[in-house]
Amino acid sequence: MMESLTVNENTINEFEIKNDIIIEQQQIQSKTSIPLLNIKDGNTTTTNTINEINNNNNNIETSTMSRKSLMTPSATYESLIRQQKTKDCNLTVKVFEARNLIEARLRKREMVKNGKSFKRAQNLLTEISSPNLMTFSDTTDPYCTVQLEKQKQRTRTIPKKLNPFWCEEFQLEISDPASAKLVLSVMDEKKYSNDEHIGKLVIPINTLKDQKERELWFPLTQPQSSKKVPQIQILFNFKPISLTDPSQPGHIQWKVLFGRNLSHSLATPLPSMSAASMGGSTSTENISNVYTNTTPFINWSVRSKKGDIVIDEEGIAWQDALTNGITRELKDSIECITFTLWRYEPKTFSDDGDISGLKSPRGTNSSASGSGFIPSTPPPSSHQKSNDTTATTTPSSTPSTPISPSSQSNNIKTPDSKTRSSSNASTNTPQTTPKSTGTSGGPAPPETINLSSSINSTSSLISNGSINVIDSSNNLHHHHNNGTNIMNPLKDGYEQYFIGQGIVLASHIDIEKPNDQWLCLYPKQTLDNKFGDIRLKLKYSEEVVLPLQSYQPLLELLQQENLYTITLLGKVTKHRESVSNNLIRVFEKTGKCLYLLKSLTDHEIDSTNNPDIIFRGNSLATKSVDLFMKLIGIPYLSQTIGPLIKKIYSSKKSCEIDPTKLEKGEDIKKNCKNLLSWVKKMTTAILSSVNNCPGPLREVFKSIQDKVVQRYPKDEITRYTAVSGFIFLRFFCPAILAPKLFDLMPDHPGIKTTRSLILIAKTLQNLANQVEFGEYKEDFMKDMNRFVIDNMENMKSFINTLSTVPADCPPGALQSPIILEKELACLYRHLIKQRQDMAEEMESTESEPKTQQEKDSFGKLIKILNSLDEDVQLASN
């Protein structure tokens, strides 16, 4: 279905825009409109009319701002914006690694213990007769699945590892952020049986809606655990200490707004409210004035950037946190805040009347609900002095439903009821992670923030409702909560039940303005109930997508002949790949992508004095050409090397020629023949595919080669390597190394296949670079030098042919449709984020002096961004 860049007559009539506005818009369009825009939808092209910005400043300003000046006051324009706007919600998930996964033998023992194994008697006999004997199925080959709504992705399998490192990234679309949940499952791949579940993690998307990047360790729960993750909504007001004057303290203020999934079977619903602002009036309709045994309590602690626990408070009643909130002074820069929720539950009595077990609430499984008990005797906090004492408060209220003999009789443990046992193991909660550094064996595990002191102190048995606060000098202060009475569990027959624990990073809290956050409460992991941890990087993005006509001035400015705005953005942005992706899709949709790529590559060639390093960096030009090849060249790639990749996957022949990696019994000469055979087939397939290469790609390569010959007329190698650096180093070779990422195969290759693909790609890369293998680096590859030398001329001939554009070239095809307004919304967001950096670049004296045209173009950009800001605010309200 064809798209239109302007509001048609039916749309105008539908929203009843005033006649004078229509007339003025038509007058403006008649002055500056020319047939310009080719909008592509698959292989179909239609020509539309779009306003072209004139060189006359008055006409440009009128064309850019007429929509705002004439239509903003109109209610019809507001309704048009609000009704036609959409939201583009995406989630980027990077799965780094897992640690401390359960061995297969331990999982099998647990299945036997729970009676879930089909061969229970046989497994029991094996465990008794030879407990240390590991069978073939006892190895753990973990992989991770990522599921969101109907989308499901998976990582490659890492064989025989309990601490696998995947480092794979996935892009997921979200249709309903309010209810969507990200579900990650760590699986154990089995060759002769169904894959086994190791652990699971559920992350509600609403906890990521602040759109801030998170890199954390998350605890895995048992595979059968519920998807209903306990959550609390907290309103923060945060002022950090002054960096210039440390004597000026800051403050942290928080209040609970709402609780979700805190209990699965409560006789009385949890009190909840929705406060408009910190310290404002609150409604008491949903607030219970009587405490019950199901009402949760909150422990919280604050960790400084020095690693000290500067605040540690326990036993704050839910209603106090809900109505009054907590305010504390800060004398240190803080790193994170930990919240722990728990509640009282009746103890379970054995048949003889003694307390002998702990009963799950109303038959629910504690692990399934993400809960467990707080250990009653934790180790002392390392930040508290040995002579620290705890002040006590006088009780002022009692529980609403004390235990009666009848209720005790109802809670007597039966053989069918599940029991819980407390543990002194430290709670494992999400922890922050600095950037990891690569080593020869992969990136080293990150140094996580150790919250053991905070966790131990908040997990301790709370007596008489005392609250401990530790200042920066580690002196213990006592604060009393006079409005709350916390009952004595030993006296009243109650004990503490752990609901969950979560962490808020100080960097995720807005400074000096109220902001609310949803916090997931993750389960306690004990020695008997530990499934491992997984490290993730999460980034949720939500873009308000306005109607296409709202972005028309921005599109016109981006497509100006001089490309000043794009050049300026490319200099300052750190997200070149994302910017390049949006630019390529916008210009491809409007039929001007080749002009964009030629301008960017010409500029980079002109600014590079050394031909040996041309296109070696990740600039806006290289990223744009790279993404353009993937945008329209995937069918060509699949047709050229796809069948060979499938044969290599199914082949059991080894190509390993590195003596240090040979398996026992392998013949290096035989492996070398296998490798040479695959390399010859792959090279032949690529060199003979030149006529199948899409015409737009060949036009880009022709432009690059012509410019290189003009810039370096005496260089005989760069004219070939400049092109092969794209078609081989950024297209064919990466696809050979990772076929799944290029949709060539549904799964990642195995270990032996991966090694074969690596050696094939190495040989092709040297052939494309016109370089032989050396004696000092990877000297085991020297046997491939004869093949490289023999095919250098064939490679040159292929590059020369590829850089010509005959009339019968195939056009290329898009794998997915391009939605122009969505791509422009992303570009608008990039420009907003880089607005200040772009202004500083314009004023910088270190760079080349800016021309008047560049200054005028930047001024127009600021006006357009301000106009779009108003539209986005209007659409969001």
UniProtKB/Swiss-Prot annotation:
Region called Disordered, residue ranges: 350-456
Keyword Iron-sulfur part of the UniProt annotation: no
Positions in coiled-coil regions: 820-848
Site feature Arginine finger, where: R616
InterPro entries per record: C2_dom, C2_domain_sf, Ras_GTPase, RasGAP_CS, RasGAP_dom, Rho_GTPase_activation_prot
Induction remark: Up-regulated by P.aeruginosa, PAO1 strain and PA14 strain infection.
Keyword Aminoacyl-tRNA synthetase: no
Domain Ras-GAP: 591-802
GO biological process, one term: negative regulation of Ras protein signal transduction
Entry protein name: Probable Ras GTPase-activating-like protein ngap
